[in-house]
Amino acid sequence: MSRRIIFIGAAGEMCRLAIERFAKAKGDWELVLCDIRPELLSNLVEKLPQGLATTQHLDLYDKQKLQAVVNGADLVVLGAGPYIRTSAPVIEACLEAKVPYLDFDDDVESTEHALSLHEKAKEAGIPIYVGCGASPGMANVLVVDAANELDTVENIDCCWMVGDERPGIGRAVLEHFLHITAGDCLTWENGKRVNHETFVETGTAPMGGGLGEILMYETAHPEPVTLPRKYPTAQRIRCLGGLHPAPFNGLGRGVGLAVHHGEMTVKEGVDFLEDLLNNKLGSAKGWKAAISGMIGQVKRKESSFSAMVEFLTKSAIGKTYPYKGGLLARVYGTKNGRPAGAIRRTVKSGEDSYLMRDMAAITGTACAAFMVLALDETGKRSGTFAPEDWAEPEAFYTALERVGTPRAEIVESVL
């Protein structure tokens, strides 16, 4: 009998990639692709094997319709963001229907809400799998892989870098970016949970994908919230992230601060970023914030004036940068009684990469691999789980291969 898998928010770029790549895994699946605009899914259905997928209109805030859709499913995958608004109603419906749930949530607040439902999920006899994307997601698995090389764990850096994807990034992604560039940042320092200001502390790491040693920013992400549950004796756990080229970070910080301080609304901030990504002029209010952010970045020596001028000049004539991105996990601790470290990172990025061609590719492919694992392990666990709680590294890497990823692209160790 076919196993019925529901995708909610299926028309989103990352979810589309997850569907395409999951379809490469062998299995008797029935895919139901739900979206508030199902007409956007027709070309996706045509790409899939005939009869594999059907489409359905769904407003996830229509509680009765949502419940009817998820009832009887073997797995529900939420791809609609921002998760701070979308995850709670879908998880509630899955608990009611007693069906497994999986998402690629990258917001702290909604991740913590899902974790608070651990006992309810156990009572319902279902798993709630959160953060099953790139970062969080594959990044957490890389941490476990690196940590397994050591005897003790003291410091963990989860690192992500996203390249130039102009034109065209979804509004939910842009809203998330503004959310992590200004405001509070829950993190783990001196062996306890503390609050920092996001996008202030910096660090560098030897990223793959052609990036090399590059500066990134501490970001408000779920990894420092979930990983201490597995590594409670660690002294420092942080998430470092950023965009390439570097001036994108100053621009985002400036607009994020303007939104955080009430000088722009969230909609105005997202509208401005969307205009820039699509080579439109953007608002004067947005440019004031963006320039302020980039100048501040130069003054702090986080980037150079020449890099800012080059970025603005290229942007003015519609030129973009070659895509460079990646994930990296760096763990310090001890081995055989001596200080030691271990690094795991993705290998390549850009147009000729399957896994790290862009943000949608890495997130969607990782999500597809987590889905394969979750379906392979149906009935094995109940409760709420972050990736480090259940996805064994080698099993995850094999799942990435099952959804089409060349083994040589998946992971490498760095001395």
Say what each PLM segment does.
Residues F7-R21:
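N-terminal Rossmann NAD(P)H-binding glycine-rich loop of SDR-like oxidoreductase domains
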Residues G27-R37:
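Conserved glycine-rich Rossmann-like NAD(P)H-binding loop of the short-chain dehydrogenase/reductase
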Residues S2, E149-L415:
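C-terminal catalytic/substrate-binding lobe primarily of soluble NAD(P)-dependent oxidoreductases
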Residues P82, A93-T111:
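ADP-ribose/adenylate-binding Rossmann-like module
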Residues L58-G72, P82:
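Conserved Rossmann-fold cofactor-binding substructure of NAD(P)-dependent oxidoreductases
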